Amino acid sequence: MKYNDLRDFLTLLEQQGELKRITLPVDPHLEITEIADRTLRAGGPALLFENPKGYSMPVLCNLFGTPKRVAMGMGQEDVSALREVGKLLAFLKEPEPPKGFRDLFDKLPQFKQVLNMPTKRLRGAPCQQKIVSGDDVDLNRIPIMTCWPEDAAPLITWGLTVTRGPHKERQNLGIYRQQLIGKNKLIMRWLSHRGGALDYQEWCAAHPGERFPVSVALGADPATILGAVTPVPDTLSEYAFAGLLRGTKTEVVKCISNDLEVPASAEIVLEGYIDPGEMAPEGPYGDHTGYYNEVDSFPVFTVTHITQREDAIYHSTYTGRPPDEPAVLGVALNEVFVPILQKQFPEIVDFYLPPEGCSYRLAVVTIKKQYAGHAKRVMMGVWSFLRQFMYTKFVIVCDDDVNARDWNDVIWAITTRMDPARDTVLVENTPIDYLDFASPVSGLGSKMGLDATNKWPGETQREWGRPIKKDPDVVAHIDAIWDELAIFNNGKSA
């Protein structure tokens, strides 16, 4: 499935009953969030609010509110197919030359996909059909949502922020929330280790006192949106990855006021700059932890131009205690992570980020254990291999006889295979999510690893327990006579 733009994707969703148009007037202040939250928790469709109160621009919510729609956005039929996306990323992260003709033939599809990586630059684009600049710029005309009662102000949530460092050819795409503080002013909340913030820091060092160009695209095609939240290798641009997903080159266009390139089909583009030293207090906002975060200062983004399509659609979301849209994305992208981790650690059987763990704060890993201390090596690998897991607070490692996605299995392994003192690893003074108020210092906290594997010689001096297993002959016999027993009157029981 290929989508040229967001509207193509919405057409398909509507045809499949995955999009609901809301014609009743609904307020972007709190009301859209309430409707979207109820719908997402019920596994419902994407929502297009055609008449937001006080605005003429429709609001799109819950676009990726189910794992199925995330898979569709990546051009796949279902979530299980996302493993193939992960295998492609693993290949791109550490490409290997073919070992022979047969291997070359097997890898041919991957090499063919690479042809879609370069971007296609357009002279004109749909995202520039309407242009507003200077004093005419007014962000208040966009139906920016206020999601929770104690939120400080309306908040842009799905903007793809485009930046470029002074020493880089490649642009960075990142998703950072942006608080509305004026008709042409937003607060750019990016954490110091994120790509946009790093580009900004390098710019300030190379060009002291000079304005840093920034553009924000809203309502890009699904492949580009998802490319910005997927763990692409550092050497691969998000646009290139979007081309791989889509099967066609990503079309971009140069901005009106700067040299940054934005998705040509985006619904809305905000162009402007950050003035070094211009900061503002951001928050509080309800976030994916289920709490309001503390107030902190971040750079101010001044918008000089707004370009948009005719009849533009504003793409938005909310974040709150899981399940929310980021949690759903986490469930789907979990399938992408598995092959990438297995490429580096072949002993990994499965990897799971429970959505109730706020998408990434707790990971369960199952392995084919091969030696004493193996579980601890895997813990350290998870924390260090992909930057997406630098904020993971808890890593639980189990044997491959445990289902990583079944809490009954995981809790059984923890309570029967762990000694708290011997099998718990604590690491202090590590990077922690700024939003994690449980850490003693903002951005710095501890991590815990739990070794819930069977212990090998060298890890214990005691005889290890042998799991109870049923007699297969008895099981087969009881299966054969189960219906005659009529215990439940409905055939076999679990």
From Swiss-Prot:
Give the membrane topology, semicolon-separated if more than one.
Answer: Peripheral membrane protein
User: PANTHER family, alphabetically?
Assistant: 3-OCTAPRENYL-4-HYDROXYBENZOATE CARBOXY-LYASE-RELATED (PTHR30108), FERULIC ACID DECARBOXYLASE 1 (PTHR30108:SF17)
* Subcellular location(s) of the protein: Cell membrane
State the similarity comment. Answer: Belongs to the UbiD family.
Function, as annotated: Catalyzes the decarboxylation of 3-octaprenyl-4-hydroxy benzoate to 2-octaprenylphenol, an intermediate step in ubiquinone biosynthesis.
The residues the record assigns to binding prenylated FMN are 175-177, 189-191, 194-195
GO BP terms in the entry: ubiquinone biosynthetic process
Tell me what this protein is called: 3-octaprenyl-4-hydroxybenzoate carboxy-lyase
Give binding positions for Mn(2+): 172, 238
Where, by residue number, is the active site?
287
Select a single GO molecular function from the record's annotations and give it.
metal ion binding
What are its E.C. numbers?
Answer: 4.1.1.98
Q: What is the reaction catalyzed?
A: a 4-hydroxy-3-(all-trans-polyprenyl)benzoate + H(+) = a 2-(all-trans-polyprenyl)phenol + CO2
Assembly = Homohexamer.
Pathways involved: Cofactor biosynthesis; ubiquinone biosynthesis
What UniProt keywords apply to this chain's record, in alphabetical order? Cell membrane, Decarboxylase, Flavoprotein, FMN, Lyase, Manganese, Membrane, Metal-binding, Ubiquinone biosynthesis
UniProt cross-references to InterPro entries, sorted A to Z: UbiD (IPR002830), UbiD-like_C (IPR049381), UbiD-like_N (IPR049383), UbiD_bacteria (IPR023677), UbiD_Rift_dom (IPR048304)
Q: Per its Swiss-Prot or TrEMBL entry, what cofactor is needed?
A: prenylated FMN; Mn(2+)
Instruction: Supply the enzyme class, top level.
Output: lyase
